[in-house]
Structure formats: C-alpha cells, structure tokens
Amino acid sequence: MTLPATFEALITEANNLKLYKKLVLQLKKDFLYANIDLDFDEDILPSSLKLILHETVYKLIQEKFAEYLNLLYIIDVSEDAIKKLDGSDTLQLSEEVTFLILKREWQKVWFRHKYS
C-alpha cells in the first residue's frame, strides 16, 4: 500500500474506493476512544472534516497535551513520524499531525476493506 502524499490525494482515493464514510466513522470511533467527542455527521464535506480535525488537534496541543498524546497512542500514529516534525510553529505542527492522523486512519480502513 502506498500512502497518499496529500490530503486531497487521500480523499480522492477514499472516494474512488467508496470508503470515505468508513474513514469518517473510523475517525469518530478512535476520537471517542480518546474521550474526544467530535460532533460531525458521516456525510461531512472533506474540507470541513480537515478544518474540524485541525482545530481539535491544535487545541489539544495547546491546552490538553496529555489528551493529545493519548489520542496519538489510540490512533497509533508513528512515533518516528511525530519526532521528525518541527514543533516550533504549533499551527503548522497541528496541520502536519492532522494529516498523519488521517493517513493512519486511512491505512486502517483500507486494510480492513482489502483483507476482510
């Protein structure tokens, strides 16, 4: 499996395979496991999804760092990928982490679809 390099490529691939709703449901499920209730519908537009996720990750980094780390653990975002990011700009960091979260969730959905 080759992971998409951009948010747009990820969404295009998810839509082409008709897995976008499953991606959204996987995100909601993992965020709920981390006790973070994201209030959005499974029919959410990709641009709105990206914005909500970005805002949520930014707030977690700024205000609830332990919950942010717990979320990364639950979603199983690569620790090495996180360590490679530049943490000097929190806004940029939160955007990059949001994409890492989306990529990891996409992996889960894709593998479940492919091998089940």
What positions do the PLM features span?
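Membrane topogenic helices and adjacent juxtamembrane segments
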Residues: 1-36
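Hydrophobic alpha-helical segments at protein termini of multi-pass membrane proteins
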Residues: 2-14, 57, 67-70, 107
